[in-house]
Regions:
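Elongated scaffolding segments in large macromolecular assemblies
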Residues: 187-250
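Extended, Lys/Arg-enriched charged tracts that mediate electrostatic binding to polyanionic substrates
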Residues: 60-118, 122, 173-190
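N-terminal domain-onset segments
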Residues: 1-99, 234-250
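An exposed acidic His-Trp-rich patch
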Residues: 134-195
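Generic structural hydrophobic/aromatic packing signal, biased to beta-strands
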Residues: 90, 134-136, 154, 205-208
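Core of folded catalytic or high-affinity ligand/protein-binding domains
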Residues: 95-155
Length: 250
């Protein structure tokens, strides 16, 4: 009913209403309505996340570069790289002819994170009683403020997916690395911060799971609606940058 009313208003004002427009209208309504939530209340999601932060026993201690396990500093270039040649490398760059920058023409030199083939940043989407929900996780990273931030279903570099670290393949990776997956809602390469990363981009994805498919969800994952994600963005250092990037498509 609401979608049809908005559609009529747009058409009366000369807008071209196509399938993409209808999808955008549905997404807009999805992002502003709380009564559609079918699983967890917003308060429950906030309390769940805060509890996960309290339960996290990860500690982070700053150490010297030479004390890093399995990371090497080149004696010739000073570049820092992993012994597997995966993950990333710290290189130096010289930037010149920077007329449009604050420093003027002289340019500058700086270290950059390079040789990172990128990875997959993916959100699983599943409809419960017809309402889209997104599977997110409370993920700990050593550089996070508060240790944990709300992250996508899958946040994995190519090295992670190839198990270069010797560990397990990330959970739910099978939903995102299937080339013939017909349930892909969105899949595009998007660049990282070019001031810190050298020629890096990640494959941002939203993949829909069939409503009748049962998933085994660990307790550090939770289903949330788009409305809830938008509300959680009002809380400082709660929603990580990768989720913010993916949902910008919606």
């Amino acid at each position: 009913m609401v979608v049809e009313e908005i559609k009529n208003i747009l058409e009366k004002n000369g807008y071209d209403v196509n399938l993409d427009t209808i999808l955008r209208i549905n997404t807009m309504i999805e992002s502003i309505r709380d009564d559609d939530n079918q699983i967890n209340t917003l308060d429950y999601v906030i309390n769940w996340f805060n509890k996960k932060r309290e339960e996290s026993d990860m500690t982070v201690q700053e150490i010297g570069i030479n004390d890093l396990d399995k990371w090497d500093v080149s004696s010739t270039t000073g570049n820092i790289s992993h012994e597997s040649k995966g993950f990333f490398e710290i290189i130096g760059v010289k930037v010149s002819n920077t007329f449009d920058r604050e420093v003027g023409k002289k340019g500058w030199t700086q270290p950059m994170i390079a040789n990172n083939p990128g990875g997959i940043l993916g959100l699983l989407m599943k409809k419960f009683n017809g309402i889209p929900h997104y599977l997110v996780q409370a993920k700990a990273e050593p550089g996070n403020i508060g240790k944990l931030q709300l992250s996508p279903t899958l946040q994995a570099t190519t090295s992670n997916l190839l198990k270069a670290h010797g560990g397990k393949k990330p959970l739910f990776a099978e939903y995102f690395d299937e080339e013939e997956n017909l349930n892909i809602v969105y899949a595009k390469w998007q660049s990282e911060d070019g001031g810190r990363f050298h020629l890096k981009s990640n494959y941002n994805m939203i993949v829909e799971v069939n409503e009748d498919e049962e998933l085994t969800i660990p307790d550090y994952f939770i289903w949330v609606t788009l409305f809830q994600i938008k509300q959680l963005l009002k809380i400082e250092n709660f929603v990580g940058p990768h989720i913010r990037g993916i949902i910008s498509y919606l």
